[in-house]
Regions:
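A short beta-strand motif that forms the metal-chelation/ATP-contact edge
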Residues: 146-148, 258-268
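Cysteine/selenocysteine-centered motifs that mediate thiol-based redox chemistry or coordinate metal-sulfur cofactors
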Residues: 294-320
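Catalytic phosphate/metal-binding cores of nucleic-acid and nucleotide-processing enzymes, i.e., regions
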Residues: 248
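ATP-dependent carboxylate/phosphate-activation module, predominantly the ATP-grasp catalytic core
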Residues: 174-175, 181-242, 252, 265-292, ...
């Protein structure tokens, strides 16, 4: 059986999706080898990985040369970024070393970085005519607001604004936050998507609701039937030109029946396992795209598929 090697960037806890990549590869006639790239080699991914490489920080100027050494030494075919900062690194590596012919299911770095800048992303969505919660501008008569750190993640640092006094606290710091209308009576829907890297063809979308989160990641999630969210996710990918694995976060205003984009992460979401079991085989789509094959278009994912994470232990002995 031919081998297919993956480099998981920041995928220390992605054991579940790692197993699904192995299964998808086997179904396509390949033996998958997973290599982790982490600051600490003693991580859960070691339970299924061939090796864990002690990596550099994403901001380290030597990271591209270090990843290239890893790619050439271990024969990596596909690089999978699993945390925000790794997406731009993976995309830039592919651009710097095109002769390696390593597949990265992500957009170019410029577009990826824009998605992780909430202000720049909101401006892009507005330019493309995509619906988002109205952005606050000085003087607007609205005091039901939410302020999100411009470069924040995992819901950290979010502040609700309910008074003029609270709003005044942001004077002089407006450029550090995205301030928008707050939707209190809402439903938040996550849509797992995949678009072919070369053509942009959307292979499939699968909406789900995060029932429980930890550290901003879904630990309990269920797939749902939401044609409106699915259609908006498809439109967002088409309008922005995003490629590869994409996670679209949508807010449904229940009072006014509005569907709007909260943010888009150009990578696999933490709860994507639910979408795979619901019928949208994301790992298979990524592998087929990497092999130059046309990924099989996913049918509508089954609603009501619930996944929940549980604790397990990986043991490392002194000589491991």
């Amino acid at each position: 059986m031919k081998k297919l090697s993956f480099l998981f960037l920041g995928g220390a806890k992605r054991v579940g999706i790692g197993r699904l990549f192995k299964k998808a590869a086997a179904d396509l006639g390949y033996e998958a080898e997973i290599v982790g790239y982490e600051l600490d080699r003693a991580c859960p991914l070691a339970a299924i990985a061939t090796d864990i490489v002690e990596g550099l920080r994403w901001s380290d100027p030597g990271i591209f040369a270090h990843i290239d050494d890893t790619v050439t030494r271990l024969g990596i075919d596909i690089i999978m970024p699993f945390v925000d900062s790794a997406v731009g690194v993976a995309a830039e590596y592919a651009a710097r070393y095109p002769h390696r012919k390593v597949f990265v299911p992500a957009p170019c770095r410029k577009l990826a970085d824009k998605m992780f800048d909430k202000v720049a992303a909101a401006e892009l969505f507005e330019q493309k005519g995509l619906p988002i919660p109205p952005t606050y501008h000085a003087g607007d008569p609205c005091l039901r607001l939410i302020a999100k750190p411009r470069f924040g993640s995992a819901s950290k640092g979010i502040v609700e604004i309910n008074s003029l006094q609270k709003l005044y606290e942001f004077q002089g710091r407006e450029d550090k936050y995205l301030i928008q209308e707050r939707i209190d009576n809402r439903e938040e829907i996550t849509v797992d998507c995949y678009a072919e890297v070369t053509t942009g063809r959307i292979v499939g979308v699968s909406p789900r609701i995060r029932l429980e989160t930890a550290g901003g990641e879904a630990v309990r999630t269920v797939t749902v039937d939401s044609p409106q969210a699915s259609a908006l996710a498809r439109r967002a990918i088409e309008e922005t030109g995003l490629r590869g694995a994409v996670t679209v976060q949508i807010i449904h205003d229940l009072d006014n029946d509005r569907y709007m984009i909260m943010e888009i992460n150009p990578r696999l979401g933490g709860g994507a396992v639910a979408s795979v079991y619901a019928g949208f085989n994301l790992p298979a789509a990524i592998i087929q795209d990497a092999l130059g094959e046309r990924p099989v278009a996913a049918e509508a994912a089954q609603a009501g598929v619930l996944t929940t994470r549980f604790l397990d232990d990986v043991v490392f002995r002194p000589n491991d």
